[in-house]
Amino acid sequence: MRDPVEFVEEIWEDNQVLFKAMQIQIKAFYDSKPNIEKLRRNFIRRMVNERMNLNEIMKSVVNSPDDTDPIEIMSLCKQALDEANHYRMVKDAIEYMTNEPLDLAEVVPTELADLTTKGARVAERFNVEHDPIARGLYQMIVEGNASCNWQVMADNLTDPVLSFSYAKIAADERFHAKLGRIHLAKILDTEEKQQYASELATKMRKDLFNLNCAGNIPIKESREMIESYYGDDWITADFNTVPLKKIY
C-alpha cells in the first residue's frame, strides 16, 4: 500500500494535463469573441451547474453515516453554502451583463435536462452521495478543474465586475478541491481502496473532458494533449475539433 498522502498527491498531479487541456478550450471560447447571447447561454449553463453542485453536496450531508466527524459535515455544509452563493453570483452577473432580469423558472428546467455539458453530472453518475471515495475524487477532480476554469474566465473577461466575481468563485473551488484531497488522504488506507480510487479517477477524468468538449470549443491541440498523456481511448464522442490557429 502507498502512503495515503503521497497517493492522493499523485492523483492530483495526474489531473494537471486534463486541467490544462480544458483551460485551453475555455480560453478559446472567450477569445473567439462570442456575442452577448452566446455569453448569456454559457453563463446560464454555469449558473445551473452551481445549483446542481449544491444539490449533490447536500445529498452527501443528508446521507452521511451516523459516525461522520462533525468537522467533515461542517466542511460539506460550507461547500454547499459556497455553491449556493455561486449560483446567486452568476445569476447577478448575467443580469448585470444583459441589463434585464433572468427568469429562473424558464431557464433552469431546460438546463437541468441537459445531460451533456454539466460537470456536476459526474457526481450523479458516480453515486457521490453514497460513496465517500467518489465524493472526495469529485471534490478534487471536478472542483479542482472548476477552479482553473473560473480563473480562466476571470482572467479573460475585461469587465471588472464579472472578473472579480469569477475570481472569487475560483478561489472557493480551490478550497473545495483541497477538502477532497484532505478527505481522501484520511480514508484511502488500504491497497484495495487505492486501486478503486485510481480506477474511478480515470473514469471521472474521461467524463469531465468529454463534458468540457460538449460545452466549449473542442480544440485540436487539447485533444492531442489528452491522447498523448492519457491514451487515445479517452474521447467517447466524435467532436469536430478546431485548431488554435483558427481562433487566433
Where is each model-derived feature located?
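Non-heme di-metal
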Residues: 1-248
